[in-house]
Amino acid sequence: MTMPHRYMFLAVFTLLALTSVASGATEACLPAGQRKSGMNINFYQYSLKDSSTYSNAAYMAYGYASKTKLGSVGGQTDISIDYNIPCVSSSGTFPCPQEDSYGNWGCKGMGACSNSQGIAYWSTDLFGFYTTPTNVTLEMTGYFLPPQTGSYTFKFATVDDSAILSVGGATAFNCCAQQQPPITSTNFTIDGIKPWGGSLPPNIEGTVYMYAGYYYPMKVVYSNAVSWGTLPISVTLPDGTTVSDDFEGYVYSFDDDLSQSNCTVPDPSNYAVSTTTTTTEPWTGTFTSTSTEMTTVTGTNGVPTDETVIVIRTPTTASTIITTTEPWNSTFTSTSTELTTVTGTNGVRTDETIIVIRTPTTATTAITTTEPWNSTFTSTSTELTTVTGTNGLPTDETIIVIRTPTTATTAMTTTQPWNDTFTSTSTELTTVTGTNGLPTDETIIVIRTPTTATTAMTTTQPWNDTFTSTSTELTTVTGTNGLPTDETIIVIRTPTTATTAMTTTQPWNDTFTSTSTEITTVTGTNGLPTDETIIVIRTPTTATTAMTTPQPWNDTFTSTSTEMTTVTGTNGLPTDETIIVIRTPTTATTAITTTEPWNSTFTSTSTEMTTVTGTNGLPTDETIIVIRTPTTATTAITTTQPWNDTFTSTSTEMTTVTGTNGLPTDETIIVIRTPTTATTAMTTTQPWNDTFTSTSTEITTVTGTTGLPTDETIIVIRTPTTATTAMTTTQPWNDTFTSTSTEMTTVTGTNGVPTDETVIVIRTPTSEGLISTTTEPWTGTFTSTSTEMTTVTGTNGQPTDETVIVIRTPTSEGLVTTTTEPWTGTFTSTSTEMTTITGTNGVPTDETVIVIRTPTSEGLISTTTEPWTGTFTSTSTEMTTITGTNGQPTDETVIVIRTPTSEGLISTTTEPWTGTFTSTSTEMTHVTGTNGVPTDETVIVIRTPTSEGLISTTTEPWTGTFTSTSTEVTTITGTNGQPTDETVIVIRTPTSEGLISTTTEPWTGTFTSTSTEMTTVTGTNGQPTDETVIVIRTPTSEGLVTTTTEPWTGTFTSTSTEMSTVTGTNGLPTDETVIVVKTPTTAISSSLSSSSSGQITSSITSSRPIITPFYPSNGTSVISSSVISSSVTSSLFTSSPVISSSVISSSTTTSTSIFSESSKSSVIPTSSSTSGSSESETSSAGSVSSSSFISSESSKSPTYSSSSLPLVTSATTSQETASSLPPATTTKTSEQTTLVTVTSCESHVCTESISPAIVSTATVTVSGVTTEYTTWCPISTTETTKQTKGTTEQTTETTKQTTVVTISSCESDVCSKTASPAIVSTSTATINGVTTEYTTWCPISTTESRQQTTLVTVTSCESGVCSETASPAIVSTATATVNDVVTVYPTWRPQTANEESVSSKMNSATGETTTNTLAAETTTNTVAAETITNTGAAETKTVVTSSLSRSNHAETQTASATDVIGHSSSVVSVSETGNTKSLTSSGLSTMSQQPRSTPASSMVGYSTASLEISTYAGSANSLLAGSGLSVFIASLLLAII
């Protein structure tokens, strides 16, 4: 991973971590100064139409303050922005809302507007401040005062152009420092920054948890660049109230006071105080009503207090209320009520209500004041003061002010313990206001239970009456621990209305359980309002654990009972457990359990009713059980177990586990017991914006891969979108069901950044077979994971039960890559990470990395890629046993990757890395194949460890319809005798898809990449064949690339790569990459043919050797001596009737192209041009036959080949070559004579002789790289041979013999054949035991084409001195038609006294020689030579062409080549290469020009390489008259120039 990616991940992680901290404990303030209503607003300069500055987060956070400050206003409570630019119309000037604008600047109701939208307008529309609302940045600061404790959601409905909102100290601004310069925090609560013309962020909102009574710093920064400006701001309070635009009563300002030390409150939750107050009120009812409310008030000391207000309303009737106050040692006031009947002194019986108030024995006095108000809820506040009583003593007095609203009945049950032996129940009636603001008649049922060991069970039943009835029964039940328990059954009969019962459990410090009931209205997930009965159960804060078990039954209502038992957790510790059994009707509803964190110390459970539509399209009534758990350090683990009952049971246990990071964690285990029916449990993970994990369950019916319908239970786990990563680990175990648990740990990813990771451990039964993971894309915004069961048949023919884990990933999150890692565990673990990578096309892509950790004890891991008709990539795993190439059986884990056949080709790239395992990932790119058609390509990148030795790729055919890639490890002994661990990548390709060709290309990467492309070629039989091209890209920095071909008995071609170090003739060691191609010993032959119709010959003969340079189509020379000396057959360049064939003495024959992407190149015409009025550019490209010459050079230098002649060529390079095509080439030639030893062989008898030879040296400079070439050419015509001192190469040549050949001559499209004697020259080359024989037929006399003569000016240069002479010359012309493009090739050859012989001394081209041509007309002569030669096992048909043209124009500079090399990625046209001069020796001038009338669309694809050709033209001039072999060399020369 690149460093920018590391920094990007670190920034994202830090931002998310800060967001998480902020959401958990937002810093608040308690400024002591004078409070002022509203916010302060500062205005700053912003440039009109600046479309980039406001897109910078740093500018929006603090950078704006560096601009010019225009002014400020204060006391603003209406803080939303809605600015409309003016429309100047015929009827006047009016503001035009943006939604009313139309067309080319018109406004509804006003008509066309004559003014411009893109200029600055001045007005006071922004908070009364005169500025340019069209282009301005403003900052709003103030303190937000929350009236309630809970989550506040701030929202921007839209943004035009850019805005942010921050809440909290050290985020918006520091406490008591509102007017200070802005701080640099970019931890925005709302990030509404959007680029110019871009779309808005998806959810322009943010949530902050705040505590009532504290002041929270709040800052809004807004920028507008041009025209309209819009920023609507709203906030939703914890009770659901939404405040929009006008924030009066919520936002305030304070003057700065940097000296106030207690201004900052880092975590307000640590400062909250809880008190309980009791208020007694008279009323006109006939009974006493008691209600309880929770509120938070801020006292005169500025400290907020959580307050429980118990309101007791007593009747003012003839009954008597007696209040008894008793002191006690507790710290709160307790109030209880009793009912009795007394007989007064008048003998009349009176019902008497005794209110016993127990007050703390402190000196404080509690005064309660009740006031009415117009709100919909009851407000309670507490103040502390000191009063002086009538006895003159001061007393601390607590004044409780209760404000009640001036406004259906609810049954509230209060349970109290007492010392009697029976249960007493009384009922009272009152009216309370619920959380929805509606008044409710409330029936208070006071249940006094004995303080014995009995358990109170509450059962709720519906009935047809309009009130709630409560009765009590006593029974004895046996719990799950086998112990009998006295149980008090409280039967509550409630009216059969459409209400929903929600149970909330709260802890308290008493020794009994209290149950109360309230009525409210909630809106479910289906948007429908539901009346909800809230049953509040207060349980003692003992060490017991509350377990809720839902059970179905046949009644029409929900019953709740409680049992006591003792269970032993997974940590072996016994736990007292309270089992709350909820019996629900057996209707079609589905129970969903949602777990939410909250700041309390107990677990609360509530229930809601809603209707959802499952994945099968059917609506389902759903009961949502909301479990609120304390936000402590414990982790909630959900375990699913089957059982034999007919309902789902949920229980909770506490245990302590040690995570993978070695830290102990308190863990809450939620055990969900599901019926052992035919349903399947599927777990789906969804992200959401909350801070806790929610789990719900749905029922649906799916059709598995077996075609059978299955009832499926979908468990939806919603996880917070924090910086943590959800990792799913699958483990086998010996149980019969699947268990899912969650752990928290911290891991360090491949980018070096630590990440909090949620590990979801899925334990599956080991009897259910293998586990396969399938990844599917979908349109959702989160990753969903489900599980299916199926039966598959492995490669060994055995059926296997397979658990398919289907991971659905969002298609908007980028690519999905699968990485396989070994580990020491005994099971396969799958986790998911998010990263951003840059593909080969330079485009960054969000990538989901699926890391599959497989056990290292299960053998090797092979990856098989299969196409299928699906639209996503599926990954599954199978187990099999294979026998490797060393004969040893190996357990193999086969990872089958099924890719969609509509996504294009699949290529496999192997990269080394420093890891200890093999990683496989997938990327998407666009490539252009050899047929010129762009194809979407899926690149499978296999990263293998560099410590495991070499990586070889073996290609095997098979009968499958897809390409399979697997990996084996073996140990081989290289050519240097050293054993090497080799990773063999076996690629099995289908035999029905045609031929398989391997192309080797150099590149700048540091590893070898292997990819596969599909193309269609037409063979010599005229039949099209589908061809699979395996492109192997090898690094150019690793030294030379050598290809060695070996026969073997296999039925396919295997390609492997070895590394070796060789010492060249220059004494320098060179790293060499040896590509070993093993070909089957069957009769595989390759025939080459020309790719166009042009057949061109020339009547010039020569006998001098020529050096032929080679460049691949991408401009980098990569052919080493080993490559050139391999058994390779390709076509020759010639312009004379020369027949050349190669026969390999063994049964192995193969065809290899030296070009990067063309494995079938056989004819490559070249062209060069020169002009009479200006210097011209010259390009050449070609492919020649392999030959038996010796070439050595230093590492990374260009490599050249010569013709098949007895010569020795050496090359040295002064520096490393560049990787691109050389823009210019300079050639220098010098000569000297020396004596050489020539070895001649005939009939396997060899002799040596001494012969004088011309030593010719030439240098070529390509992009600053200079290479020197030395050639020894024997002067005499006596045939000699030389045996080289090499370990792998040996060159011999036999004496010549003569024969008669048939020559085809063509002129004006009319061809004739003539018989001519020819010299037969044969030579053999033995390379690594493979012998190749080369035979050349050179006609002794040739039929020359019709010639015309003209005068040419020949410039001769020697030793830097040039002279010009006029000489008659023979004009020889030829035409070639390639893809309907006709090219005329003229040659001017100056006449000499002896046409058949020229001086044996080569011209020295130490300077630049320019040849000016004066001829104005061209005639066309065409001579064709076609020879078919049968040589034993191999048949080669060679048709050779060369191209030369002339013209007296200088504007056009064109080089053409056949389209077989037109797909190079580094093609450079002549018109782009600069001024490369065409240099020739005296005696030969060539010129080429494409006809000016030729359309550009008809041009043939070409590849060019700039090289000055003066040496080669001069050499050809020196070889015009000679023996047979010289024809071959001269022909090559003319083809090049």
From Swiss-Prot:
Q: Where is the PA14 domain?
A: 74-249
Repeat sequence: residue ranges?
278-322, 323-367, 368-412, 413-457, 458-502, 503-547, 548-592, 593-637, 638-682, 683-727, 728-772, 773-817, 818-862, 863-907, 908-952, 953-997, 998-1042, 1043-1087, 1118-1137, 1138-1157, 1226-1276, 1291-1341, 1342-1392, 1408-1416, 1417-1425, 1426-1434
- Disulfide bridges in this chain: none
Q: What ranges does the record give for the region 18 X 45 AA approximate tandem repeats, Thr-rich, renumbered to this chain?
A: 278-1087
According to the record, the residues making up region (3 X 51 AA approximate repeats, Ser/Thr-rich) are: 1226-1392
Mark out the compositionally biased spans (Low complexity). Answer: 773-795, 863-885, 998-1020, 1161-1220, 1405-1414
Cite the residue spans of the region called Sugar recognition.
197-240
Q: Which residue(s) hold a covalent lipid per the annotation (GPI-anchor amidated glycine)?
A: G1514
Task: Spell out the Pfam families in the cross-references.
Answer: Flocculin (PF00624), PA14 (PF07691)
Keyword Coiled coil: yes or no?
A: no
List where Polar residues composition bias occurs. Answer: 1222-1232, 1392-1404, 1472-1497
Q: Name one GO biological process term.
A: flocculation
List the signal peptide residues.
1-24
Practical applications according to UniProt: For many industrial applications in which the yeast S.cerevisiae is used, e.g. beer, wine and alcohol production, appropriate flocculation behavior is one of the most important characteristics of a good production strain. The ability of yeast cells to flocculate is of considerable importance, as it provides an effective, environment-friendly, simple and cost-free way to separate yeast cells from the fermentation product at the end of fermentation.
Region entry 2 X 20 AA approximate tandem repeats, Ser/Thr-rich: which residue ranges? 1118-1157
Q: What is its main location?
A: membrane
| Membrane topology (UniProt) | Lipid-anchor; GPI-anchor
Region spans: 3 X 9 AA approximate tandem repeats, Thr-rich: 1408-1434
Copy the domain comment.
The number of the intragenic tandem repeats varies between different S.cerevisiae strains. There is a linear correlation between protein size and the extend of adhesion: the more repeats, the stronger the adhesion properties and the greater the fraction of flocculating cells. The Ser/Thr-rich repeats are also important for proper cell wall targeting of the protein.
Q: What biological function has been recorded for the protein in this entry?
A: Cell wall protein that participates directly in adhesive cell-cell interactions during yeast flocculation, a reversible, asexual and Ca(2+)-dependent process in which cells adhere to form aggregates (flocs) consisting of thousands of cells. The lectin-like protein sticks out of the cell wall of flocculent cells and selectively binds mannose residues in the cell walls of adjacent cells. Activity is inhibited by mannose, but not by glucose, maltose, sucrose or galactose. Also involved in cell-substrate adhesion.
What family is reported? Belongs to the flocculin family.
Q: What is this protein called?
A: Flocculation protein FLO1
**In which organism is this protein found?**
Saccharomyces cerevisiae (strain ATCC 204508 / S288c)
User: According to the entry, what is the taxonomic lineage of the organism?
Assistant: Eukaryota, Fungi, Dikarya, Ascomycota, Saccharomycotina
